[in-house]
Amino acid sequence: MKNRLYDATKIDWDNLMFSTKELWMLLIPIMVEQMLNSLMGMADTMMVSNVGSVAMSAVSLVDSINTLVIQVFAALATGAAIICSHYLGKGDEKGANKAARQIFLTVIVISLTITAGGLIFCRPLLRLIFGAVEPAVMENSIIYFLITASSYPFIALFNAGGAFYRAGGNSKFPMKISIISNVLNIIGNAVLIFGCNMGVAGAAISTLVSRAFCAIVVLYFLRKPKQKIVLNQYLTIRPDFPLIGKVLAIGIPAGVENGMFQFGKLAIQSTVSTLGTQAIAAQAMTVIFENVNGIAAIAVGIGLMTVAGQAFGAGRKEEAKYYIIKLTGYAEIVLIISCAVTFLISRPIMHLAGMEAESMELCYQMLIAITIAKPILWALSFIPPYGLRAAGDVKFSMITATCTMWFCRVALAVYLIRFQGFGPIAVWIGMFADWGIRSIIFSIRFLSGKWMEKHVI
């Protein structure tokens, strides 16, 4: 089996780039950071849910757009992590620092452009996507979107800065920033939502402040000289278009993949919005639980980009394949545990969130299906692609993910809801089909070895 998956004879087992201990030291802080990032969205939704289903639905709908935008920034961070990891793997810290400066410039320009567009076209955008929702939900959505859109540059800069630290093997520092940020967010929610009765506006302002804190802190500490990647003298940065092109060669396909994924979710969300406020609220909470039970496994994938990227940069292709297999196994283990734990705590959390009985029962039924299907299908469909991206095979991942998203997940969900009378469970039936087909396609791609013919730098 090892010879089929990787050539063990070409790996220097006495001089591995990452030991098992070092892998977990990299992965655990990323898991904590990702959990805290998810908790920020969960805190908004749960605390707003006590104001009522209208407010909860507004936050859920707008966060589906916010997630789309954040995924664009995550794609740029993916490019940052892979490019910088390759440079560091080959021992070229000067090249890594030069790339980091260009990534910073690119992130600033793109995030400010998206923010300006969001603020200008807020109302027509929301009416286009969620025109069928109740007027009260729409008004709350507009308020929440205008404020959270102002935080886009901050979250973009923090994502890029965190990617620089992780590329250098330091995943603890971004985690520490996230811990403080989430404490600020929860305190802000409590004060503004309940103390000042500001509803969705309070949740949005709290999110804005906490994201601004993250960006300011990470940019300040990137100026310190005693680390692998140093970023300072921001005003002296000038565009290096060939280098920006290398970053975008990774970032654009990853961004298109993430963007199409989120557009698909918006299409599904638009369909679910026709089922009424109870179904929207149930789906919103189910999405939160599904995000939570996959956080640890996603963190493994994020860590894999650094690990495989450095291995490829050092020219150790078989060792990179070994890490992809090993970390896919890690992801499966943490996925089984997190799905079980999330399911066990789901009912108390739904009660704590003040969900209405009908929404709660719908949510619980969907969560049962997710807890069974996700450990079987998810890991092979998502973790190996992180390794393929680290090798520069981003276009194949983009095409595959886009096709399975639209032709399986979206098409099946829309068909079942609009033509077969299904409720929100149709969303998850489509998702399970998507995961299953992805896992087959990416397994075949990995075994073919064609993905290792790509070049990053």
Question: Which functions belong to the PLM regions below?
Answer:
Residues 56-116, 155-174, 280-346, 378-401:
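Small-residue-rich hydrophobic transmembrane alpha-helices
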Residues 35, 39-57, 126-135, 191-198, ...:
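Helix-terminus/linker motif at the lipid-water interface of multi-pass membrane proteins
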Residues 30, 34, 45-46, 82, ...:
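Transmembrane alpha-helix boundary and packing residues in multipass membrane permease domains
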Residues 77, 147-166, 174-182, 203-218, ...:
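Short runs within selected transmembrane alpha-helices of multi-pass transporters and secretion channels
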Residues 25, 48-67, 135-140, 200-201, ...:
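Interfacial/gating helices of multi-pass transporter permease domains
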Residues 14-46, 50-51, 67-79, 83, ...:
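N-terminal transmembrane alpha-helices
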Residues 1-27, 84-151, 195-252, 308-374, ...:
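Short alpha-helical transmembrane segments in multi-pass integral membrane proteins
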Residues 25-44, 147, 181, 210-214, ...:
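Transmembrane helical elements of multi-pass membrane transporters/channels
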